Design a protein with these regions (language model features):
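Alpha-helical transmembrane segments and their membrane-interface boundaries
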Residues: 1-210
Length: 210
């Protein structure tokens, strides 16, 4: 059961334990979990690299980050509608970076702004979860390590597999959350005058101009 605790939960347990022997045991279990996660990360990226090619190792990183986030995070909307958000996010990751690399810098800037802004709206309505950093980072990595031809087809295939995996994990862990907001509420509640949405726009502009 202790292995199933989150990082925060493990640290709280260690701090709350007064018996030195028990504290050492909790620390050893926590360190074991850290090494286990590292081994899992290396295995996932290596598997993706072997299946989709070395040029697509970044796909493994992107999917891995998404899986680690969606194990615990949510989108602040109904779980079934959250699956739609995941579909939208991965569709952007499959197409946005490729399209922006096909055009000149000025059109590419506007494409990136739109894509990153959509990633923020779809993936970061619940700001506390910090989902935005994962998906925006994945977008920038895929854009920076662009591929064409057969390698791009493999990239899309790898992202499709990752999307399905994320959907399964997300639904399994979040299906009992009682959210009333729907997918469309993500767009209905968009207001350029709100602090959250101004932050969305600033981040999209900054990331696109980098």
């Amino acid at each position: 059961q202790e292995l199933q605790l989150s990082s925060v939960g493990s640290k709280q347990l260690i701090r709350a334990t007064e018996d030195k022997k028990e504290k050492r045991r909790h620390i050893l279990i926590y360190n074991f979990k850290v090494y286990l996660v590292m081994a899992f990360c290396v295995a996932v990226v290596s598997l993706y690299s072997s299946l989709t090619g070395k040029d697509n190792s970044v796909v493994g990183v992107t999917v891995l980050l998404a899986v680690l986030v969606l194990r615990q995070a949510d989108f602040g909307i109904r779980t079934t509608h959250g699956l739609g958000s995941i579909l939208g996010i991965f569709t952007i990751l499959m197409t946005g970076p490729r399209i922006s690399n096909l055009v000149s810098p000025v059109p590419a800037f506007f494409i990136n702004v739109i894509c990153i802004l959509l990633l923020m709206i779809l993936g970061c309505h619940n700001v506390i979860m910090y989902n935005h950093s994962t998906f925006v980072l994945g977008y920038l990595l895929l854009q920076g390590y662009d591929v064409t031809g057969k390698m791009y087809v493999r990239r899309v295939e790898g992202l499709l597999v990752g999307m399905i995996l994320c959907m399964i994990i997300f639904y399994k862990n979040q299906k009992n959350r009682p959210y009333r907001r729907t997918f469309l509420d993500l767009f209905r509640e968009f207001d350029v005058h709100s602090a959250r949405n101004r932050w969305y726009i600033r981040l999209a502009l900054i990331a696109s101009s980098a």
